Amino acid sequence: MAHSKTRTNDGKITYPPGVKEISDKISKEEMVRRLKMVVKTFMDMDQDSEEEKELYLNLALHLASDFFLKHPDKDVRLLVACCLADIFRIYAPEAPYTSPDKLKDIFMFITRQLKGLEDTKSPQFNRYFYLLENIAWVKSYNICFELEDSNEIFTQLYRTLFSVINNGHNQKVHMHMVDLMSSIICEGDTVSQELLDTVLVNLVPAHKNLNKQAYDLAKALLKRTAQAIEPYITNFFNQVLMLGKTSISDLSEHVFDLILELYNIDSHLLLSVLPQLEFKLKSNDNEERLQVVKLLAKMFGAKDSELASQNKPLWQCYLGRFNDIHVPIRLECVKFASHCLMNHPDLAKDLTEYLKVRSHDPEEAIRHDVIVSIVTAAKKDILLVNDHLLNFVRERTLDKRWRVRKEAMMGLAQIYKKYALQSAAGKDAAKQICWVKDKLLHIYYQNSIDDRLLVERIFAQYMVPHNLETTERMKCLYYLYATLDLNAVKALNEMWKCQNLLRHQVKDLLDLIKQPKTDASVKAIFSKVMVITRNLPDPGKAQDFMKKFTQVLEDDEKIRKQLEALVSPTCSCKQAEGCVREITKKLGNPKQPTNPFLEMIKFLLERIAPVHIDTESISALIKQVNKSIDGTADDEDEGVPTDQAIRAGLELLKVLSFTHPISFHSAETFESLLACLKMDDEKVAEAALQIFKNTGSKIEEDFPHIRSALLPVLHHKSKKGPPRQAKYAIHCIHAIFSSKETQFAQIFEPLHKSLDPSNLEHLITPLVTIGHIALLAPDQFAAPLKSLVATFIVKDLLMNDRLPGKKTTKLWVPDEEVSPETMVKIQAIKMMVRWLLGMKNNHSKSGTSTLRLLTTILHSDGDLTEQGKISKPDMSRLRLAAGSAIVKLAQEPCYHEIITLEQYQLCALAINDECYQVRQVFAQKLHKGLSRLRLPLEYMAICALCAKDPVKERRAHARQCLVKNITVRREYLKQHAAVSEKLLSLLPEYVVPYTIHLLAHDPDYVKVQDIEQLKDVKECLWFVLEILMAKNENNSHAFIRKMVENIKQTKDAQGPDDTKMNEKLYTVCDVAMNIIMSKSTTYSLESPKDPVLPARFFTQPDKNFSNTKNYLPPEMKSFFTPGKPKTANVLGAVNKPLSSAGKQSQTKSSRMETVSNASSSSNPSSPGRIKGRLDSTEMDHSENEDYTMSSPLPGKKSDKREDSDLVRSELEKPRSRKKASVTDPEEKLGMDDLSKLVQEQKPKGSQRGRKRGHAASESEEQQWPEEKRHKEELLGNEDEQNSPPKKGKRGRPPKPLGGTSKEEPVVKTSKKGNKKKPAPPVVDEDEEEERQMGNTEQKSKSKQQRTSKRAQQRAESPETSAVESTQSTPQKGRGRPSKTPSPSQPKKNIRVGRSKQVATKENDSSEEMDVLQASSPVSDDTTQEGAEEEDISAGNVRRRSSKRERR
């Protein structure tokens, strides 16, 4: 090919063949055509063509002229750029351009052309790609390293490439760009900050989100150049982080984002930077620390991050930020936890301790987020969270903030549904969270209506989902009920009871609305609205919304009809859902973003809609029970023994028979129940009888074949069945049959005739049956009953001791060891009481003579004939029966009036009986009558005597009873403002005169001026006054003061002329007055009204006599210390997130929550005494844990305690204010051993006094169960209660050796049993009566077994336990006059103190507990199950004490 004849050496330009001169004189199109040919020529050339290189040198120089570099046409520029790229390739390594400025212009020109890469759809894109490929391949830009302006060129190139890259580019474009840029970094001497910024800016989140491809390009570039670029990155961070030179780069503010991105790209890029972060974590700048924490949270929490294992110091330093003083930092740490738990299960152990502290953070948001983090991880996989973490969620269900409680409850519910109901992770996972169902239901004990509504919602949606098909739903409920613990069962029963009650209230409201409008009906509607309002959240708003809803119901018949259908007893579950849907749909129009009115009505509808139980459901449930009976159910697969499942199923049906009786009305159901009646299991038959009693009202009319089959069974049960079945058989006949008189006659006559006092074994059932017939049909058998009582019951049974009792010094034995004669006598007493309660009058003086008989039994210690034939345990049983009988009769007004003051005072002393079980059961009977407002107010004064009980748990229980009863009365008065005529019998403050009178007549109060006896009086008064004075409502302090002043102006009505008696009365008044003055600042104000004193107890005040004398000895003054009484019922204390009852005080840093710092002066006592054994807040759960008796105030107390993972041990000295020393369990055991040694050195008591002075010492009461068992084994052959107790004052623990007392380790018990038991909502009153005494044996039997190892099996029957431990330590023959009066012994005066710290802590913990329990939702019918568990452990504690005293 011939060339144009232009020589190269004369500066003329040689063009490739066929290409004419390219100048500004030709058109653009022609120029483009010619340039394309030039491009082709250069493209085909290679570096070896020396001749051609020489030939086209001038052309190469010409193409670099400004004419081309600044040409306006982009196509021209592109072609020129491609030529220049090839020229650099061909002439490499020496470019034909020598001028630095020209080189800069050329590379800036090429860079500009690279922008054309942006449009991938351009026809020229391939040429742009060629340009990129060429310069990347040749590394043309490396020429610029020598240029002064190289940084500007590179920076421009980088910016251009990062700006043009987009998702239209393929992998090759991406790769060439990386090649081009990486060569500049890897082969250059330095990387300027500006160039580094152009790379790093693409990692900043804002840029990253705008151009993901640029981010990927930067990422690839950094990975490729990691080694080369690392020093420059380190320098950059060093400048910004350590030296604070933020001006060196615009990216300084994004430094933490960059670190994260760089770490994710390649951790080696930050090898030298990470240690700087440790320094930054300790910065004084809150915001800076927060930034670093946010950064590290992402770095540590990232899925494949190994940072925690690679950089342990940084990890530890980061964990320290969980305790940062700045709230947002702690919040950030907590939020990070869920990612960490999910992505790095191996770090869970490290996080647990820190999350524990944060779960007690004073900031609500942080406690909330701890829950969220743990629950989020658990929902992903239950194996990611350990038991400790789940326990933190459990604890927070008792948080003081609703938001936190709600999150914890919902979290647990979701976890339960996923792993227990749906078995998402197998049986092991289900086992791990089996406690959740119990825990969630325990929350129903909370006072807060929000908590209870949420439990109801959780139950309906997560525990037994209402949308399950009926059979599946009932199976779910059946096995749930069979596996719940006792507390949860009672809570669930209570839930159904509350819902049923509310359903009836709404039904009543609808009935009232349908009546014609009158003033009376409007008042009745308002009253009903107020009752319903109390069952909804936010009563203030609820009241307004309920009024509005009432108006809607009056105006809108459709809604009213739907609501009527919903509350109808025949409403099915499906129908209920339809009704709720329709009502909410109508109320929801017009639609609003938020409609609080609709939300409130939804709450109401949720509570009353029967979404679980209808006739079909009951039928399905019965079938499920039948399957278990037939052995075709999968009980074992569900982890429930068949017997337990059947029993639980019948119990469940029994409860539902109270709340949904109509749903049982089907032949199939009744036939199945008939089959259950014939089963051998007594409990099953008993439950079936109760179900018939509750649901059988229509059997006679609708199911005649059931009636005829049932009647002979009932006759047989009432004559020859077990006593409890006999009782229910009689009640069934009464409920079902219209011909009940005939039936009763057919049963009564043969039983009456066959009564044989010599055949004791067969007397109990007839006595029970006759007693209940007498109760239900008193007039039908009036004459035969009267003669039966007079001749057979009193003369033949009670006044006769046929068989000598076993010789033993035990005070209590199990039922099977009680002599048959005593069991018959107990039933005889009960039969008399039922007869009197049926008669309800004293016309024939039968009540008077019965009361005389009962008090004689009490007076004679249970040995009515005083022949000495009856054994001590039998005497205890008879004392209990007599005391309980008087309490029962006192609940009937006609008998209350005839109980004399002496009889009342003697009955009161049963609460200080020497036998623990007598005290315990009597207290429960007393509480039951009081809490139902059936017992007169003077019986509440008896609780004051509990201050003398040596066992802390008994004092604690008595205090709970008082709190509950005072609360019940105050609530009643608030809700029934019109009952002012009953004020004297209801106002709790009126218990003060009765208490003063009772204490003045206390047989222990002998010497009027005796300091020790007066201190006892003060204890008892403070026991009552502390709770009454906790709040000064309506100036009640002044009212109480006025009452006490008025008493001093009267005389004792029991002995108005007895000077000594009146002096005692005035002295007790002065003790009360000193307490009031020392504890109140408002006592001197004017009393709101003049108190009226009970005329039976006090004479009319003498107007002419002013009794201003002070009857107290001067030295008593020092025992009244000023200070405010601790609050008995403060709602704010309900859910302290950081203090669990019984915990030791924590440091501020560990708790970060303030607790009340009540000093020991809050009890009116000597300085050496702290807080009294039972101060207002001293509910030392350490001892109380095992005592899960049917507390009047069940619920949260033990929950809080259960959650506490700290144990307390104190060594205290009298009059000491030292901080309690907190020891670990090993140390505590050591202290146990120490106390044992001390005891062994004590001389044994040689006298047996009638009265027991020594209380169970605290250290023995609080021993670890295993330690106790060990001691029992060592001393197994020694009967702890046989040892004669030393003489001393009633129930007051004497001064221990050396004047010090050790409170030793908290008794650890299973979490399962340590809640207070609520009574079932639907319990037959008499049934409870019968169970109480008959089952103390069961209660006692398990005492010895109650070790922590076996505590989990609490729900199982304790029949197999050893008998030895059932004995009760004689406290002392409290109150019954001694047959051989012993001279009063001086009492050691030092009160054992407890440390100020612990006292303070106890304040908090039990303040919480009191409130939790003060208005527990659960009814106070203290049933056997409730009482059982407290007694079980009571024995353990009491047994220890007698050992100690004997030594």
Curated annotation (Swiss-Prot):
Residues 1247-1259, 1287-1299, 1371-1383 bind DNA. InterPro entries: ARM-like, ARM-type_fold, Pds5. Its main location: nucleus. Residues 1172-1184, 1196-1214, 1225-1243, 1265-1274 have a biased composition (Basic and acidic residues). Interacts with the cohesin complex. Interacts with RAD21; the interaction is direct. Interacts with WAPL (via FGF motifs) or CDCA5 (via the FGF motif); the interaction is direct, cohesin-dependent and competitive. This is Sister chromatid cohesion protein PDS5 homolog B. The keyword Membrane does not apply. PANTHER family: ANDROGEN INDUCED INHIBITOR OF PROLIFERATION AS3 / PDS5-RELATED, SISTER CHROMATID COHESION PROTEIN PDS5 HOMOLOG B. It is found in: Nucleus. Keywords: Acetylation, Cell cycle, Cell division, Mitosis, Nucleus, Phosphoprotein, Repeat. The keyword Repeat applies. Highly expressed in intact prostate with levels decreasing after castration. Expressed exclusively in prostate cells inhibited from proliferating by long-term androgen exposure.
